[in-house]
Structure formats: structure tokens, C-alpha cells
Amino acid sequence: MSATTKGGQEPVAPTNIRKRRGVQAEGDTESSTAQDGIGHAPTAQYEQSEDQEQAKLRQANKSYGRTPDGTVFTVPTTHDMVSQLLDPRQPKNLSDVIVLAILGMHILAAYALPSHLKRPVFAAIFIFWRASYNIGIGILLRVQSQHKLLVVKAKKWGIFEDPASGKNPRPWLYHLLKRELEAKIPEDYKLEEAPIEYNTWLLFRRVVDLILMCDFVSYCLFAAVCGSTPDGEAPWATVARWVMGWVLVGLNLWIKLDAHRVVKDFAWYWGDFFYLIDQELTFDGVFELAPHPMYSIGYIGYYGISMMAASYDVLFISIIAHLAQLIFLVVVENPHIEKTYNPPPPRSAGQMQPLDGAKDADSATRDSPATVHNMLGFKNIDLFRVPDYTTILLCIYLGVLSLATPKTEFWQAAFIVHAVLCRLWFSLGLGWILTFQSKEKRFTRHFVKYGESAGEAWRQWKGLYHVSTVMCHGSFIAACWKMYTVPADWTQEWSILKHVTGTGLVALQIWTAVSIYDELGEFGWFFGDFFFNNRTKLTYRSIYRFLNNPERVMGSLGLYGAALITWSRAIFVLALISHLLTLAFISYVEKPHMQKIYGQSIREEAGLTKFVKRSLPPPVKEWSDSVDKVLDEAKAFVEDFVESARPKLAAGVSTIVRDTTALFNTYPARLTISQLNPSLAGLDPKQYSLSLEGTVAQKAASGRSTGKESIHGRFPKDVKTLVLEYGAPIRVKWTAPANHSKNDWVGLYMVIDNRSREVTEVPSQGRWVPTCPGVYDRATDGGIITADKPLPSQPDMVQGEMVFEGDRLWWTQGTFELRYHHDGSHNVMSVSEPFEIKIGRFDEDLDEEVLATGGGVYERAVESELLPLVRNCLDRDPEIAPSTVDEPFGSPVERDSKYAKRVVYAIHHMFGIEFAPAVVPADGNVRKLAWRICNAKQVLAPYSMSKSRGTTTPLGEKFLETL
């Protein structure tokens, strides 16, 4: 599912539509009642009033959909796929018969196949249907989300067009679809009246029904053919296994039903990929229990079925299917949810971006930009930074020591003691520092006493905490390695199950740590509000929407997972000690500071707690309240006792720090050679032409003569190569015969990429625009300005205009060309003149005289050069690109790193200064970025890429005089 909507809320639909339909319904009721009630006025009046109330109630319960073009329509009531297929009261159609027949063939195969073929065959069948779900449906939804491709294809093929209009080439298909779809929705639906987006979604639903039902049935059949009772299993173990399995299956069924109650068919079948319902996004019921419950806890039934089947084959295929579903969530659904329900906010012109506490921490002055050199994550490792260098050396030390020493009792005890000491320092030592930092800023005062700033104290603390975290978890892993022994027989003592369960717990802790870091950032991860007064308010998003302190339990699951894998008492005791210290740290370090800083804004109960309490029966609620009261009194007594004794207890957060990053797969250009299309016969390439225009680079067209050529080679050439600005839009005009193919397209390529001028050998990688709209998807039509305009001088010729901008450009320097292709192929009809895209070097010859006048003048000069460059890098989009040096960048700059990478690339080639992409969203406007450039050039003056102005080598007689 991609979203959740509150079914009980009244939809925000246009009032006139609702009023008009309500009046019409009331009028119909009145007329019918009047006809039936002649001579029975009181009864007729009563029935009329009752019918009116029912009509109003039905009208109020209706939902209204809205298509991308703004069309509002009534969303008919639909039913879930199980009811549609198996409920005899629901109308049936041909597609139901087909689905039931395919399911019957699956069941028949489970009985008919030989025993030795059942497992591999049904494993292959389930993998096929699971791939159809995660890959097939995933591709369809992704192209629909990005390009509305399913709707575009439905329009292009005319499958929902009335044959009477003459636009439908397949009348039989239209009548079949009309009969099939209207049979399922007897009320409020007519195929010819519904928007094409809704009709396309209904057709998509039928495909989804087939895949989901076959996926579930094939999985159950695979579990059935693999099920068995282990040899020597005790009766109590068999009963416990089946009871626990059915409990998990029942819980899974309840999760699915409650989720469907909340989201209805609209979100269950990814309706918001096609249209939107005028209702608010909400989270209710099971959606308060866990993040993405349909894909997280919604698959626990798989493990219940695996438990009842007592088969590792079923368990492993369940894990693979669950992982595939999570990948589907990350790749397909999450990007669409972010785009649809969390779009970037509009940029307020002229409003400066405030710096948060983390940025204030690293800012030396009011005007200086914030540092963006993050500490966590493999991508942020920097060997020039002392904490990173230290952690790598310590990890090498631990690894070498673990591998070089034998697994004797002495060394095992030594590694356990070492892990305990590291945990005690991480918990008690760092907890003591944070406690006094919260009360009297002792850590910061120490650095201020020696003339350092609060920012320096913050940086030193981050390094200390980072090294301590790595040592704490590294020593624990080393101790586990010393205590671990590879099982001699994996089939004995539940060895496989212990390893699988332990690995799952470790993965869950890693996911928890990543979720916490993604939500808190570096400032929250390193307890930044202990050092600075953070002006932001508490927000409960991501994992914090369900849990107030996720590290309390989930942050230590990996420790117990390691204890399961090693099956060692010492590791279990070490995990228990670590968990207890984590709980103490939360209670005596974090919680008092949170109450001191945020006060009443702290939430008392998380979403999971509220959900569990609401689900309890009244007697259990009363008992729970009494237990909570006793625990609160006992807690108050313990706190008073501890405060009176004044021991400072501290503990550390026991979480594994691993910053996972998105993997960007870079595919190499695949060479393709296309054969000449027979449709080229009779076409004259001379009738095709391309011309272009764009913003000419003023400083890039410098002479290429270096003085090393011959006399003839030093003269400038007569023909000047067109040189365009980096990132500026390129307007292209084309001409072609009037009978040219509507599938023609123009692509942008580097000159060196293609050896042939007749056939293009490399893919365009998205840098192309069709000549005519409506042929390809909607996204590609965005580059079309005009199409097929007749030439007044040549009636048999047409012309058009298009623009290459944004992602259709090459964001690098080089020599490029445009190619006109025929009929959707790679056959070239025309090639434009080559042109260059260059970034002009900043005119640094004026540095000395400008700096003599004042550094502010030099900074203004940098700003004036930087502003148009940044505007080009931000696609000249008024919602993103600034119009002045003080105007902040749009929020997409922070969301999509491509903009920042463009800017730092351009700065590197214009000013000779190399920045990390993260500095662009951190600075937030051109003025701060210019300040950073000026400051960097001043610091790196002897090492910059600028021309040297130092003392030159003496020449001639002056050199001889110096000898």
C-alpha cells in the first residue's frame, strides 16, 4: 500500500457538486414517493422523510476522486479480492473464472505431481509469482508514478473509447471490458462516464488480483508439500510449534484486515498512483503499531507457516520473499509517497534560511557558513581527520589481535573483560561527561578556559563519542568471534534456526540505528542539545512515531542475536549488562536532560503504547493502571534514594552505528547497432535539418593558439565553434518533410560517442525529446515547444521547436551534437553542428587591484559571477533557483543531491576550488557560497589552480648578475 486514508472523514469535494447530486437524489425520492403514496399522505410523508435521510447518508459516505487534470468524480464502492472471488453473493465475471481456474490448476498440480518434483516445481512457481509481484507490478507502478505511462498507453490504444466515436480500433475489447468492469461495480459506475485514470486503475486491479492470489496460494502449497514432523520431536514441541504458528498466522490475518479497514481498496491497490481521493492522509489502527505494517509485521504469517511446516526450505524462501517485499517498498512505494504526500514546500522569496543548532555549533562567526563534514557513514570516512584515522587503527588492532591469538580460555576471558571495560567506559564515562555537561556545561567550559570556542568543544566531543562507540561495538564483536565455534553438524541443536534468528535480530538493530540516525541527524545522534540551545521543537516522525525510545529494546536486540549465534553464556551476560546499562543511561542521563530542555512538549505515550492500551479489555486496563501506579511510586522512591546518596549513575546507548547509503548502480553504455529500417526508403536526409541556439559563454571562447604550433597553425580559424554556458537550456529547431514519422525524436550526444553518422551506436540515457506530442509518455513531451508547423515557403515541409534543459542536458564540459532519428529507431536523418559546453574561468587578473580596494569588492565580483552559474545548475526553476544572492535555494536542493553536485563541479572549474556537495544546501544561498569561495581562495592561495603571481625565474643579464 502506498498511503492511508481515513474512511470516516467527509471528503473535501466541491460543494456545488455535492449539493447538486444531493438535490437530484432528493428530487428522485420525492417523485417516486409521491407516485406511490396517493391517498396515504401520512405514510407517504413518513416514507419520503426516511428515504431522504437514507439518501443523504449515502451521499455523505461517498468518496470523491480527483485526477491529475483536476477532474472530480464519485468513487464507486468496491470490495476486496477475496470477497469478489469467493463470496457467492458478489457478482462474478469472466476474469473471476480465469483466476479461480488458475488457482484450481495450482491445487491440482500439488496432488498430481510426483513427490520428488513437488518441491522444486512449487518453489519455481512461487518465485515466478513473487517476481511478478515485486518486479512486474513494481515496474508498472514505477513508470506510472514517474510518467503516467499506463494511462498514456490506454489513451494511445483507445481501449476505453466508445466504438461509436470511431477512435477505438478494437470494439470487441471495449465491450468485453465494459461488461467485466460494470459487472463488478453495479452502482455509481459507467465505463464511458468514468475518467480514464479510474478505468485504467480498475483494469490494473484485475491483474493485481491474479498475481496476489496466485502468489499466496502457491506459497501455501509449497509449504504444504514441504511440511513434515521432525524425527524425534517431542509431542509438547509439536503442539507448541503448531500453536505458535497459528497465532502468528492469526495475527497476520488481523493485521491485513485492519489495514484494509483503514486504507480501503484505494490504497490497497495503489490507487494514488492513478488518481487521488479528496481525503486527508492519516494513520490509524495497525498503522500505529509499526512502520509500514503491511510489509513489516504484515509478513509474520510467513514465519508462522514455516514453523508449522517445520521446513528450512519454507523458512528461507519466506525470508527471500519478505526481503523482496521490503525492496519493493523502498524502490517503488516510498519514492511515490514522498512525491505525492510530502512535496517540497514552496520557497519564500527573500527569506533567509535559519541555521539550526548543529549549524550554529560549527559556525565561527555569524556570516560564516556551516561545516558539513559529517562523522558517521562509510562515505564520510576521511583519513585526514583524527577520529577517522584513530578508529581505523583501532579496528585493525582489534582484528589482528582477534585473528592472531588462539581461542584458549585465557584469551577468551581477556576479550570478554576487554569488552566489559569498553562498555563501562562507553556507558559510565560518557554518561558522566554528558551529565555534567547538561548541568554546568563542564565539557564546554574546559575548552573555553584555554581560548577555544564552543564549536571546538562540540567537534572534540563528537570525535570522542565516535571513537568510544566504535571501540565498544568492535570489542563486543571481537569477543563474539573468540567465543564462536562453527557447528560440526548444522542439523543438530537447532543450529540453523539459531543463526537465522540471530542474524535477523542483528539486522533489526542495524535498521533501528539507521532509522534513528536518519531522523535525528548528526546533531541528535551526538547529543547536540547537551551542548547548544536547539531552537527546534520535538517532532515524532519515522521510528519515533511508534516508540519514544526505540533504543530501549530494539537498540539491544542485536546483542542478544549475537548471543544466539555464539550460544555462549558469557556473551549472553555481556549482552544483558549492555542492555541494563542502556536502560540506566536513558533513565538517568537522557530523560532528565530531555525534561529540562523540552518540558511539557515531551510525549507521554508512543503510538504503540496507545494502540496496545486501546486494545485491552476493561479489566486488564484497570489492572494495568494499578500496576503503573505502583511502578511510578517505586520509581519515585528509587530516584529519591539515589539522589540522596548522590551517586552518579550513567549508561550508554547500546546501538550499532552503521550508516547505510543508497546504492547507485552505474550501468556502462551498451553499444547497440541498429539495422537500417525499410521505412527509410524514399526519404531524403537532405530534407531534414537541425539548428540550435542558447546562451553563449562569454569567457569560454578563448584562443587555442599556444605558440607551439607552426606559423600557419597560429592563425585563428574562420569558422567559430558555438560555445554555450554550462547548464543553460538549448533550444533546437528542426525541419522535416510533412509526411515524416510521428515517432521521430532528437537526442543529445557527445561527439566522441558515435563513430557513425548514419546510425547512433549508444543510448541517449534520457537526453532526448520527441518531435510530436502524445506519442511517448507525458514526461518526454515536456521538452516540446511547437510541432509540425507548416513552412510558408515550402508547403511540403514542417518545422518544430524543442528545448533541452534539466536532466536532458550533459552536466559536464565537452563537445556535443544533436541527432534527428527516424521512426523511434536509431537511424540518423540529420546531425547538427558540433558545439561546446564550457565553464569560463573567473577573471582573476583583477584580484590584486580588487583586493587592494577591499575584500568586499572582490566578494561582490564572485557573487555576480556565481549567481547565473547557480541558476543554470538549478534548472532556472523559480521554485528552486534564486533570483538574488540573498534568496535561499529551494528545498529540492536538500532532497536531491544532483543539484549540489552540479554546483560544486561548476565552482571547481570556474574558481579552482573543490567543495563537497553537502556545502551547497548547508550554505543555502549564493552570498554564503561566495563567502566560502573567497575564504577558501585566501587560505589555499599558494596551492590553488589560479595562475601564479609569485616571483618568476630571473632571465638574461639579471640572472647572471645574481651569480
From Swiss-Prot:
Q: Which reaction does it catalyse?
A: a 1,2-diacyl-sn-glycero-3-phosphoethanolamine + S-adenosyl-L-methionine = a 1,2-diacyl-sn-glycero-3-phospho-N-methylethanolamine + S-adenosyl-L-homocysteine + H(+)
Look up the EC number in the record and give it.
Answer: 2.1.1.17
Q: What class of enzyme is it?
A: transferase
> Gene Ontology terms, cellular component aspect?
endoplasmic reticulum membrane
InterPro entries, A to Z: Phopholipid_MeTrfase, Phosphatid-EA_MeTrfase_fun
Q: How does it sit in the membrane?
A: Multi-pass membrane protein
What UniProt keywords are attached to this protein's entry?
A: Endoplasmic reticulum, Lipid biosynthesis, Lipid metabolism, Membrane, Methyltransferase, Phospholipid biosynthesis, Phospholipid metabolism, S-adenosyl-L-methionine, Transferase, Transmembrane, Transmembrane helix
> A Gene Ontology molecular-function term?
phosphatidylethanolamine N-methyltransferase activity
Q: Where in the cell is it found?
A: Endoplasmic reticulum membrane
Lumenal side: which ranges?
A: 1-96, 142-206, 256-284, 333-385, 435-463, 517-569
List every stretch annotated Disordered: 1-73, 341-367
Which residue windows are transmembrane per the record? 97-117, 121-141, 207-227, 235-255, 285-305, 312-332, 386-406, 414-434, 464-481, 496-516, 570-590
| One Pfam family per UniProt | PEMT
- Write out the function statement from the record: Catalyzes the first step of the methylation pathway of phosphatidylcholine biosynthesis, the SAM-dependent methylation of phosphatidylethanolamine (PE) to phosphatidylmonomethylethanolamine (PMME).
* Family per record: Belongs to the class VI-like SAM-binding methyltransferase superfamily. CHO2 family.
Official protein name in the record: Phosphatidylethanolamine N-methyltransferase
Quote the gene name from the UniProt entry: CHO2
